[in-house]
């Protein structure tokens, strides 16, 4: 490993020179995956060298400032407001009653924090409306969501004591509206839909979910952390006809990550609310100490200014034309990959992805090795029997792609799948990936190889 030979976690007695420090950092990075070469299909979103250079310059220019107090750094307050307003416009604020003036929101450190805040706001809304507990305070609020909804909602459930009611998706991997409606009761404060869901890249039936939530008198959050900065531009291109934003009646909040398809620096996300009344429930304020007013819009107190500045810069640098171009390039690359997968014997795409995220692996209808646990995994997968086998072992395919071309895909289950978040940086190498995939799929099928490592990992605690 690259870290071998380095001192064991000790502060050096004598400081090192800048060149030595930077050299050691580069040595440590030698085992990192090659995202610059388009080999990584998760975690990183690249709009090219020019954008990356801009992000580095703007983040460095604001490396010392602290967004904890924008009275000291009003530029940060202004940039945050501008990002929120631009995002609201992209997500339909200009087309709803009340217009952009009614849509309020905040920046967070990323999608997880945005989902935490949306859940916390829903819990507090339930309390303010006396929707739970009947005044006794003993009932536990709950949220209803599909098994495909992001894992961060489980963290929110744990942090804020909101019961998570996970409902199996249908065979198409989309939220089952009727089953979710059956799970709502007097203690429900939130219904969740995804645009798209991370695991299979499908957009949930948001109009139906939102209408159902509105009819039952509960809030509806759309998790567009993944799609918020690409779906609007695919819509402009006529490549997506789904309705999922604030133009859908009943949608009460939306989250969108600027550091994903907005191509900003990690980490900056936006969470928006349909009304000022809802938005006011998110921040925390107190004077109950000796240091004066303490206020924060999200979980953190100190917030780094670099991602805010870089996010603001990339929005204005790319503009609508730039985002439309990147969206089209990304969509074409994703469609090329999907077509290649579907043309290869023994492989299949999971569901019918709507945009630029997809999951694939061994075709369960082709016969052969067992590729997934299906509904046996505690009912977490989907309605229906997906336990058939495939001549191509999905994780052996992933191993072969890594060995042949250094390609990295997240592995997920159930069902066993390789996950591909296709972004603009992949457009130049998608042909190379398809060639390698074509070669190794045949080899894995012919040899009948099966991966020993069956682990699946989305995030680590290191």
Regions found by a protein language model. Give the residues of each.
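N-terminal entrance/gating region of PLP-dependent enzymes' catalytic architecture
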Residues: 1-101
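Active-site nucleophile and cofactor-binding loops and adjacent substrate-binding regions
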Residues: 75-76, 105-112, 145-146, 351, ...
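Conserved PLP-enzyme active-site core in the AAT-like
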Residues: 106-295, 384
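Alpha-helical scaffolding segments of alpha/beta enzyme cores, especially the outer helices
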Residues: 208-211, 215, 336, 396, ...
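Active-site C-terminal subdomain of aminotransferase-like
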Residues: 236-354, 361-363, 376-379, 383-384, ...
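Conserved PLP-binding catalytic core of the aspartate aminotransferase-like
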Residues: 346-434
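PLP-dependent enzyme catalytic core of the Aspartate aminotransferase-like
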Residues: 372, 421-462
């Amino acid at each position: 490993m690259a870290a071998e030979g380095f001192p064991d976690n000790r502060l050096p007695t004598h400081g090192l020179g800048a060149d030595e420090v930077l050299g050691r950092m580069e040595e440590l990075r030698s085992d990192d995956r090659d995202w610059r070469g388009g080999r990584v299909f998760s975690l990183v979103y690249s709009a090219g060298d020019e954008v990356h250079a801009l992000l580095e310059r703007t983040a460095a220019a604001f490396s010392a400032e602290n967004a904890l107090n924008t009275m000291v750094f009003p530029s940060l307050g202004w940039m945050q407001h501008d990002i929120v307003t631009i995002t609201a416009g992209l997500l339909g604020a200009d087309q709803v009653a009340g217009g952009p003036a009614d849509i309020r929101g905040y920046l967070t450190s990323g999608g997880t924090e945005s989902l935490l805040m949306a859940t916390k706001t829903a819990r507090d809304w339930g309390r303010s409306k006396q929707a739970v507990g009947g005044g006794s305070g003993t009932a536990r609020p709950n949220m209803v969501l599909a098994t495909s909804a992001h894992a961060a909602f489980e963290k929110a459930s744990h942090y804020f004591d909101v019961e998570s009611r996970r409902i199996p998706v249908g065979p198409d991997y989309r939220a089952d509206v009727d089953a979710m409606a059956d799970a709502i009761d007097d203690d429900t404060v939130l219904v969740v839909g995804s645009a798209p869901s991370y695991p299979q890249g499908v957009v949930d039936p948001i109009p139906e979910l939102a209408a159902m939530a509105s009819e039952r008198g509960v809030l509806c959050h759309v998790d567009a952390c993944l799609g918020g900065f690409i779906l609007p531009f695919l819509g402009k291109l006529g490549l997506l006809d789904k309705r999922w934003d604030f133009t859908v009646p009943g949608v009460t909040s939306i989250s969108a990550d600027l550091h994903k398809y907005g191509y900003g620096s990690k980490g900056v996300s936006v969470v928006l609310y349909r009304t000022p009344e809802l938005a006011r429930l998110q921040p925390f304020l107190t004077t109950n100490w000796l240091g004066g007013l303490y206020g924060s819009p999200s979980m953190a107190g100190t917030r780094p200014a670099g991602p805010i500045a870089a996010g603001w810069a990339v929005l204005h640098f790319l503009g609508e034309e730039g985002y439309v171009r990147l969206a089209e390039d990304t969509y074409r690359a994703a469609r090329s990959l999907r077509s290649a997968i579907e043309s290869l014997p023994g492989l299949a795409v999971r569901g019918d992805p709507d945009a630029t995220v997809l999951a694939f692996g061994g075709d369960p209808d082709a016969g052969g090795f067992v590729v997934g646990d299906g509904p046996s995994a505690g009912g977490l997968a989907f309605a229906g029997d997906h336990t058939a086998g495939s001549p191509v072992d999905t994780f052996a395919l992933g191993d072969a792609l890594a060995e042949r071309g250094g390609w990295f895909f997240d592995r997920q289950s159930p069902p066993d799948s390789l996950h591909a978040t296709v972004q603009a940086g992949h457009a130049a190498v998608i042909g190379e990936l398809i060639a390698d995939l074509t070669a190794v799929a045949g080899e894995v099928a012919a040899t009948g190889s099966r991966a020993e490592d069956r682990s699946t990992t989305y995030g680590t605690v290191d």
